[in-house]
Amino acid sequence: MNRYLLHIIALTVAGCCLPLTASAKKRDKSDALTDSVMRRIFCYAQQVDTTGRGNRTSYAYTKFQMRTNKRNATLMLVPTMYAISHGAGRKFITEFYNRITVDEKGTPHISRQLNLSTIPHRRNTMTSVLNYMTPNVYGETLFQENILSPFHRTNRRYYRYSVTPLPYGMAQVYAYPRIKNTQLVETRAIVHVRNGQIYLCDFEGEYDMTRFYISLTMGKEGFKTLGPVKCDLRANFQFMGNKITGKYTTIYDLPKVLSDSLNNVEDTTLMAKVRPIKLNTDEEMIYRDYYDKMERRKKQEEVAEKEKKTDIVKDVLWDVVGDNLLNRISSGFGKESQGYFRIDPIFNPLYMGYSQKKGVVYKFNLRGEYAFNKNLQISLGIKGGYSFKQHRFYINVPARFNYNAKHEGFLQFQVGNGNRINTNRVARQALGYIESKDSIGDFSPSVIPAIKDGKTDYTEFKDQYYRLINHWRFNPKWAFELGMVSHNRIAVRPEFYHKIGYPDKYKSVAPVFGLEWRPKGEKGIVLKFDYEQGIKNLLGGNIDYGRAEFDAQTILYASRRRSYSMRFGTGFYTMRTAHWDFVDYTNFHNNNIPGGWNDEWTGDFELLSSQWYNASDYYLRANCTYEAPIILSAWLPLVGRYFEKERFYISGLVVKHLTPYTEWGYGLNTRLVSLGFFAAFRELKFDGVGCRFGFELFRNW
């Protein structure tokens, strides 16, 4: 009986193992094919001869049809959408024909020769989607610095791959994200098994409020196999009840047909001449309805002109004022588009931010440039902001004249109102660190308790500054700056300083010198030395001082869009006189107009009291940041898919009477906002927490 049971068990186990063994062999064979094909895809771009890819010119045709399925008043808040947010129908079509010149570094320069559009005023709409039309399939990121490509070796940890063999030596490759995240895409491609060349490719994903479906036909020979010859895209945009659908088609590598002198011309005859594919019935109908409408409107305007009637609400308030208040204003000018100007929306709640010290801050930015030739350019910018918590308006106006491109020679004049500042003596007393030299009459912080909490401007000075700098680079490693800087400081409450026998106005005028060293050239660490020497009686100055600062900063870029930002610096005053009352460092100051996630690394301390910036005659600080698209929060279920970047912050500071001060932070970047959470430690003791956020919505639109 026992022997019978043993036979039954043995046969059962053997029967179970046979299909498992066959399945295992089949799976092993499938895995081997997948690994083999993916290795060839990962290596394909490095094996292609790219000779001739630079210094060449080609032409491309793009058409897109847009439909507003649902819309409401909030659509006018979306950049580039104001023109289609009211009236003007529901369907639109745009075509343009571009000249693309690739320089020696492989950077494309695009000039638009023809442009037809039924969008009012030929406005550019959903321009951010056009970035999806030229994906870098074999690169680390698909679209400029966004979306991790499944066909780059460093990103394979984020994808699962499956390969199905097809006839004629081809295979179908599927790539599935291991987690749901806006930095990853679902992918299907037809590839050649022998060398890993991609012939056809489809991507599906979501980024920056847009759901997209992309279908590519890749080039067939040489370096052209690294890019598409045709791209079809469907984009779905949804925002606060608005639903917009777009269909895009771009065809690349077209022959030259028109004169290169054409610049953004609206001509239906020329467009029909270069159009490589026919319009479908729906597209022809959109054009027909549009031109019929324009003809009727022209006749109505002729009648209105005779009757001298003007629709103030429609023509002025809605089209002009509303457009300029809620939409970006940008335009080029000059016969060959030598100049441009751009103004951020004047009134748009999406352009606000928040920080612990300044509360809600509204920001705006204006910039323009004109190029006389490759060497000579002039530019002007206006960057401003208003702090609702401080009830203060900040502005910075830089004007720059570039006169030598090879040596980065430029002359820059900058004017603005800086942070309000206390004298260093008042600042130290407000912080509770009174030194023998700080005697200033009968003043004591106990008279004004609110000073300790930073809630009064009773002792502060307003600051109006001017800065003129000439910059010159000797070679890729060495550069210098030479110029002049002036500060006019006027007491907010002059009567306070009159009472204690101190001046209520100070003016400093100082020559400045800077020396910059880049040991590894353009890419790598930047070391800079700055020296500023205030001279009494120079152009009306009444302060003598000397200040030196050393600064070192670098950003190390790693694979998978990771980066390490580091900045170290020190500064000190070398000369002091009887009226040496202001401590104002160049590289250690309170940033009065904070930017968004992509601002340059400035070494801000989020929770540090503003009094500390001008209480010590020396400082030593270090700031480090680690950034990556997927660290911790991206792996969370449900919400993790919306986190596009994450950061860790570590900042340290040593000043007189505060040794050390540290801040630790964690930041998140989503399509809507950037968030930062910080904890401060004062002399190794917990000193509080805080947060900061800024709107990121449509920042790249």
Predicted regions: what is each one?
Residues 62-69, 235-241, 253-262, 416-425, ...:
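Short, conserved secondary-structure transition motifs
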Residues 58-62, 159, 185-189, 199-203, ...:
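One face of beta-strands
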Residues 1-9:
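Bacterial N-terminal signal peptides that target proteins for export
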Residues 24-170, 179-184, 248-346, 350-353, ...:
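Structured extracytoplasmic
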Residues 5, 21-24, 553-555:
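Glycine/threonine-rich ATP-lid/beta-loop region of ATP-binding domains
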Residues 162-267:
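Gly/Pro-enriched, hydrophobic low-complexity segments
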Residues 142-147, 269-701:
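Exposed, low-structure sequence patches enriched in small/polar residues
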